[in-house]
From Swiss-Prot:
Induction: Not induced by elicitor treatment. The gene is fCNMT. One of its GO terms (cellular component) is cytoplasm. It is found in: Cytoplasm. This is (S)-coclaurine N-methyltransferase. It is an enzyme of class 2 (transferase).
Length: 361
């Protein structure tokens, strides 16, 4: 009940004010973390149903609805915000392999560089890659996996696919520097592209979250798999429920804090067991969210230690606007803080990484 004589600000106005303060770096990290944890708790209350019957119904209903959608939506919006950033910035924030996804920390003393390699090695092991295999890396980012596979398996042909010009140019330049003649980079949108060849192994790391119609996507990828080919997928997930990455209600400021609303799906750990029309699941693993939480923590440490180097880069890409440059720095700080809290929630036992190995039907 409102106190007489005092005007209560509308919730939307409060959230707008909060987001403005976050943009300007006016909220202490501890307070940001606390606010994020509150929203994550609300998401758990929203997603965890009171009966298992309701839980499965929610999951199955989402799989049915996705089958009615396009393969992907709002790809350009996400690309502009997340992936078209200066390579020099990524060289500062990421490890030496420029792996922009979950890394694998074997123990407390593992460095970010070691964790990058450990995860790349785990991909190769779980995908059962052998020297001489033809390998397709879909949504290759800055080429961490492409370059690692090409260097490790000298007799393999590795094809990377990206829809980013800067990523393509960087991977091609790195291939030349490393004298790798077994790398090809294609500039393409995988939702519309028709691949002329088939591959022994197809690797997809943290791309499926940005897709919608997995039935059509997997049907498309199946056509690119050799007869005995395997598809390895890494995706982030919640252990129990899946959801469109959209605000729960008008109080949910967090969902739009890092990613544009509606551009992502957060699958459940078991989500892709429901999409076996064209491929079959061979194996399935999960990794504690603590690995991705620590990855984000290491990224944030590097970012904070090099803010003075990063500022001029962002001033350049924001049209010589220092205020916009600081907003961009604060955005990336928020990205890391969000990842730390989300994947670290409940000791890494809520949101985590899932690995799925498929074979062709």
């Amino acid at each position: 009940m409102a106190v007489e004589g005092k005007q209560v600000a509308p919730k939307k106005a409060i959230i707008v004010e909060l987001l403005k303060k976050l943009e300007l770096g006016l909220v202490p990290d501890d307070e940001i973390k606390k606010l994020i944890r509150i929203q994550l708790g609300r998401r758990l209350q929203w997603g965890c149903k009171s009966t298992y019957e309701e839980q499965i119904a929610q999951l199955v209903n989402l799989t049915h609805s996705l089958r009615q959608m396009k393969i992907a939506t709002e790809v350009e919006t996400l690309d502009d915000q997340m992936y078209e950033v200066p390579i020099d910035f990524l060289k500062i924030m990421n490890g030496s392999n420029l792996k922009g996804s979950c890394c694998y920390f074997k123990n407390d003393s593992t460095t970010l560089d070691e964790a990058e390699i450990a995860m790349l090695e785990l991909y190769c092991e779980r995908a059962q890659i052998k020297d001489g295999h033809s390998v397709l890396d879909l949504g290759c980012g800055q080429g961490a996996l492409t370059l690692y596979v090409a260097q490790k398996y000298k007799n393999s042909r590795v094809t990377a696919v990206t829809n980013s010009v800067s990523q393509k140019e960087f991977i091609e330049e790195e291939s030349r520097k490393r004298n790798l003649s077994n790398v090809e980079v294609l500039l393409a949108d995988i939702t519309t592209h028709k691949m002329p060849d088939t591959y022994d192994r197809i690797l997809v790391v943290e791309l499926f979250e940005h897709m919608k119609n997995y039935e059509l996507l997997l049907r498309k990828i199946k056509e690119w798999m050799a007869k005995d080919g395997l598809l390895f997928v890494e995706h982030i997930c919640h252990k129990t429920f899946a959801y469109h990455y959209e605000p729960i209600d008008e109080d949910d400021w967090f969902t739009e804090y890092v990613f544009p609303a509606g551009t992502m799906i957060i699958p459940s750990a078991s989500f892709f067991l429901y999409f076996q029309d064209d491929v079959s699941v061979v194996n399935h693993w999960t990794l504690s969210g603590k690995h991705f939480s620590r990855t984000n923590e290491e990224w944030l440490k590097r970012l904070d230690a090099n803010v003075e180097l990063i500022k001029p880069m962002f001033v350049t890409i924001t049209g010589q606007c220092r205020q916009e440059a600081m907003k961009l720095i604060n955005y990336w700080r928020g990205f890391c803080l969000s990842g730390m809290e989300m994947f670290g929630y409940n000791n890494g036992e809520e949101w985590m990484a899932s690995h799925v190995l498929f074979k062709k039907k």
